[in-house]
Amino acid sequence: MQFSAAFLATILSATTVFAAPAPAGEAVSMMAKGPQWTIQGLNRKCDTADKTCTWNFKINTGAAAATSCTYVVKSAKATPKASRSNGGPSKCGDFTITSGWSGQFGEGNGFTTLSVVSNSKKQIVWPAYTDKQLAGGKTVKPDQAYAPAALP
């Protein structure tokens, strides 16, 4: 009898230790409803001195005709070069574009992340491209698609 009472007490205490934690509160998904946005035909061409880089692409939200965009990033100093500079804001139709370069993965592994905001829909995507994808001004293939997030 003593064994079974001790065993039962152990089992009951163990169940409280392993009980699921209480939820911390509800979270709201910030992902927008609707289709992914596709960045079409993107290329970045920099001048020989790397003081100006011109990005050309189309933003296709899947809800209307694609919006053509020419986005220019300039470097006023010798460093960082335009290909490694932050840029914007710049307007392309209903969209506002900004960008930031990162070298966090080491030399030769840099990448640029664009912020593409639909001002009317209050939605955003963050297309990102490696320096290798953008090298030589070639068009990135295949096109890349991103799920938009809703801005608060």
Give the positions of each predicted feature.
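Fungal secretory targeting signals
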Residues: 1-26
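A generic structural signal for short, solvent-exposed coil/turn residues
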Residues: 4, 11, 31, 49, ...
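A broad, structure-centric signal for solvent-exposed, well-ordered loop/edge residues
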Residues: 8, 46-49, 104, 123
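Short, flexible beta-strand-to-coil junctions
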Residues: 17, 60-62, 117-122
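Short, surface-exposed binding/anchoring microloops in extracellular/periplasmic proteins
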Residues: 25-78
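Acidic, low-complexity intrinsically disordered segments
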Residues: 80-152
